[in-house]
Amino acid sequence: IEFMQSSGGLTDALSLTGKDAILSGPAGGVIGCTAISEINNFDSIIGFDMGGTSTDVSRYDGNLSKVVEVSSGGINFNASSLDIETVAAGGGSLLDFDGQRLLVGPESAGALPGPVCYGLDGKLALTDANLVLGRIHPNFFPKVFGIDQRQKLDQSATKLAFEELKNEINAATGSSFTLDSLAQGFLDIANEKMAATIKKISIARGYDVRNHTLVSFGGAAPQHCCSIARILGIKEIVIHPFSSILSAYGIANANQFRYAVKSVVEPLTQDSYKSSLSIIDSLASPLVLELENLGENSKDISKKSFLDLRVVGTDNPLTVPFDDYEVMLQHFIDIHEKQFGFSPSRKIELVNVRVEVTATSNRIVDNLLDSNVDAPVAHSETEIFISGNRIKVPIFLRESLPKGYTKQGPLMIIDEKTTLVVEPDFSLKVNKFGHLIMEQDSIQQVSFSSERDPVSLEIFNNLFMGVAEQMGVSLQKTAHSVNIKERLDFSCALFDSLGNLVANAPHVPVHLGAMSDSVKSIIYSNEGKMKEGDFFLINNPHRGGSHLPDLTVVAPVFSGDNELTFFVASRGHHADIGGITPGSIPPFSKHISEEGIIIDNFLIVENGKFRQDEFIELLTASDYPARNLEERIHDIKAQIAAVNKGINELNNLVEKYGDGVVTSYMRYIRQNSAEAMSDALESYVENY
């Protein structure tokens, strides 16, 4: 018996440990994706695995991206794992209304009682929305539902539950939802959340998501994949015949795998590079012997070696394949530039030597389809709600589709395991392996009205928060200090043209509650003088600062007609900003100047140029100058990079949806927050 590991390889029972199997199921899906990519010669793919409770996404470009730490239940484990991002959005994600917004998840209906359509008094879930819209067909599901487990999906109960929710929402908001438009609204919200997760493993790491093929699998993904591709601008989608059980397919394709790591932590030099060769041999030899003792042929055993490298003074290393010294060094620099946006400016150190040994197994061969068959005839037809209308679409059984068959959407394809919806702007082709390849006819722009509605309100809430989250990812990756990189003592947020807080990532509350005053102080001090490419620095507690070590970088965002439209800011705790004691938190200070340097409206970047000399003078021209200037400079540059990320992403939103729509929804989100707080206070008064 062989067991799957989070790293994407198999091991025996004696070698298996719990921490190495935490993500073994999703890892199987990733390995399945790699098999699909290689057989179709795709350059880069995004794995989109949507199941019942969550969605897992991954990326593959010929190399498996791995991490050395896995998180589960809030606990971090040091374990080699494939790089997989997860979002709580699946078929069981609960649908709700908070009085102003439609909500999808993160709670799940689970398998019992499950969604309303299971007939067990469950709550409305995403599966119910797909059923109402016709994206799944009850006649093709087994009769295993209801109390006696012999009933079909309960379509009437689902419609009744949606009818009740629709009436509640229309009464509360003055909207005019129909059953279909309400269900579609919930789907739109879920699709945006899943698309945002895909951005985390692509755009946030420097990869253009539009240059990838979307490999969709899991029971629910084929109903959503066209919408996800449209949101992200992805042109090509592939659905494997085993798409709903691709994790099992991947595990069947996985290889026996062993790995070993040795910590080194020394400067990367020609000498340390040569020393790593002997370390690699000492690590690999016992792993190869172990596989040979299991009966693996030595000809089928291969090894890969990697070095974990990092810039001196930083914590998180980047893993690069072992190669010639100069080639490997350039590879590290290229990855660093792609992820962080700049070249490493300090010395590089070798942290770990890694070895992976794999016994290549025979992969499952996808059967070739026979093209010498009659053209398929639609099994039946059904109605699906698409693009605001109900339209009739043909249903084809997957087994009837021959190699080379093509058809323009819309249509539905059903097999024993899943249902695929091909939307009108996609064309279908069946390749020789029976893989369903869909291509988007032209990249469509998703449009929204500037009028407030509960669906768009939640979508833009997630979009704005997603921008702040991407800023946080950039800041954590580029920072040098332990405070920001490891303790995560930072916050990122978006503000309207008046400096009012609009959206933030789930960062430090004390930062987020005060940052708006800092932004407003910058606005007041620079009214009519700010230009594109200007970034400002402030930490003054009398102007919204929390305490002096918390430095805030603020930048304006201008629209196409050079009108100041938004502000973006990041706040980070610096290890030292001067003062009478290291750390800038003296317990017996009598005046704020003894805590450190007060910064008020300092132009840190002018016209896109970092004012390093002026910044150093600011930090040193004091009775109690700042310590460790190099770290201060690098952390401020990281904050600037994060703010710049926010500016770029906001500009992308404006380009995609229009300036009027984006600014309107910034206003609506603030209105919604005020209304929600008012309702909460009224409820508190009534109850207490």
Model-derived regions, located:
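A short, flexible low-complexity segment enriched in Lys/Arg and Gly/Pro that occurs
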Residues: 1-7, 61-71, 98-104, 187-200, ...
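Conserved phosphate-binding catalytic cores of ATP/NTP-utilizing and phosphoryl-transfer enzymes
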Residues: 8-45, 67-82, 92, 197-206, ...
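Short, hinge-like loop/turn segments at secondary-structure boundaries
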Residues: 19-20, 63-66, 254-258
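Glycine/threonine-rich beta-strand-loop-alpha-helix active-site module
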Residues: 44-47, 54-104, 113-115, 240, ...
